[in-house]
């Protein structure tokens, strides 16, 4: 049995197919979704989504949004999404290191918030390509 997954960003449809299982990061923690899941509407944190299709796992970095589960389908609306296959590993590592440094030297509320968001985005991109293992400490 499968469920239909649609991942949509403002400028494109990132994913639209039947899948076997989904694991994603919500604002209250990770959830797993299988066919016949109870209806749910949840906010998504910056993090990754794992998708199982034909016994193989694929990952994507999601930059926050919302997910709705209903009638063996999941629709995800995100600010931005990148498939692991679209992420340059070298660039992702460099961005992560830079974001770590920026977060460490951030001063003031606004700068700390912006640096933390940049760090979370960089961390999600690395997790999507399995360069770093779970969990990564801040």
Swiss-Prot record:
Keyword set, alphabetical order: ATP synthesis, CF(1), Chloroplast, Hydrogen ion transport, Ion transport, Membrane, Plastid, Thylakoid, Transport
Keyword set includes Cell division: no
Membrane topology label: Peripheral membrane protein
UniProt record similarity statement: Belongs to the ATPase epsilon chain family.
Domain of life where this protein originates: Eukaryota
PANTHER family for the chain: ATP SYNTHASE DELTA/EPSILON CHAIN (PTHR13822), ATP SYNTHASE EPSILON CHAIN, CHLOROPLASTIC (PTHR13822:SF10)
Gene3D superfamilies referenced in this protein's UniProt entry, alphabetically: 6.10.140.480, F0F1 ATP synthase delta/epsilon subunit, N-terminal
Recorded GO MF terms: ATP binding; proton-transporting ATP synthase activity, rotational mechanism
Protein name, UniProt field: ATP synthase epsilon chain, chloroplastic
Keyword Ion transport: yes
InterPro entries given in the database record: ATP_synth_F1_dsu/esu, ATP_synth_F1_dsu/esu_N, ATP_synth_F1_esu_C, ATPsynth_dsu/esu_N
Cellular localisation: Plastid, Chloroplast thylakoid membrane
Major subcellular location class: plastid
This protein's encoding gene: atpE
SUPFAM superfamilies for the chain: Epsilon subunit of F1F0-ATP synthase N-terminal domain (SSF51344)
Organism: Anthoceros angustus
Oligomeric and partner information: F-type ATPases have 2 components, CF(1) - the catalytic core - and CF(0) - the membrane proton channel. CF(1) has five subunits: alpha(3), beta(3), gamma(1), delta(1), epsilon(1). CF(0) has three main subunits: a, b and c.
GO CC, alphabetical: chloroplast thylakoid membrane; proton-transporting ATP synthase complex
Functional description taken from the UniProt entry: Produces ATP from ADP in the presence of a proton gradient across the membrane.
